[in-house]
A protein has these predicted regions:
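Intrinsically disordered, low-complexity terminal regulatory regions
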Residues: 1-77, 165-169
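Regulatory sensory and allosteric helical modules in signal-transduction proteins
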Residues: 49-50, 56, 60-66, 70-116
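Short hydrophobic/aromatic beta-strand element in the GNAT-like acyltransferase core
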Residues: 50, 120, 133
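Short beta-strand-to-loop transition segments that serve as allosteric relay/switch motifs
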Residues: 133-142
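Amphipathic alpha-helical "output/dimerization" segments
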Residues: 144-161
């Protein structure tokens, strides 16, 4: 994995974090209707062109819900800003990505894609592991208020609740 961030993207609890993600057994599945609908609602709520529900695996970031990046189901972990968002239990916000030192070599920021704004709230398990993000992306710089941050966190909680319910159903059916 190539790291384009000029900083580590592996949390100290990486091994346990990946085990927590594996428990839910949803990493290899393609995007699904529930999470894609959630991504669309998030995009409309925040008036952004792209919203994603992502899971951060060992090598890739998988998009379980995708609005605005049609046909893209995964991105190399070393390029996805979601890799930075799982390092913390609080949201990660880049109001103007081009001004962030850790993003100056990231191809999504400096390349043709032109990412300028990113806000990602971690999807956190009951045990405290950040397994993915609910994030929004824009091509223009943008301020993000405290109220908006709280709403994004609520969307991440909803995503985690759905993942937990699916995990319970899957494990009870075995």
């Amino acid at each position: 994995m190539v790291n384009t961030f000029n900083k580590t993207i592996l949390p100290e609890n990486e091994v346990d974090r990946l085990k927590a993600l594996e428990y839910f057994d949803i990493l290899n599945a393609l995007p699904d209707r529930y999470f894609s609908n959630l991504a669309r609602i998030i995009a409309v709520t925040f008036d952004v062109p792209i919203a994603l529900v992502s899971l951060v695996g060992s090598e890739d970031v998988i998009f379980k819900g995708n609005f605005g990046m049609k046909g893209i189901n995964r991105v190399d972990r070393g390029k996805s800003l979601c890799s930075l968002a799982v390092l913390d239990l609080e949201p990660t916000i880049f109001a103007d990505a081009i001004k962030e030192p850790c993003l100056l070599t990231n191809p999504l920021v400096i390349g043709e894609f032109g990412l300028r704004f990113y806000a990602g709230a971690p999807i956190i398990t009951k045990e405290g592991f950040s397994i993915g993000t609910v994030c929004i992306v824009g091509k223009e710089p943008r301020e993000f208020s405290a109220d908006e941050t709280e709403i994004l966190k609520l969307f991440a909680e909803n995503a985690m609740h759905e993942i937990e319910m699916r995990g319970i159903i899957k494990h009870n059916s075995k």
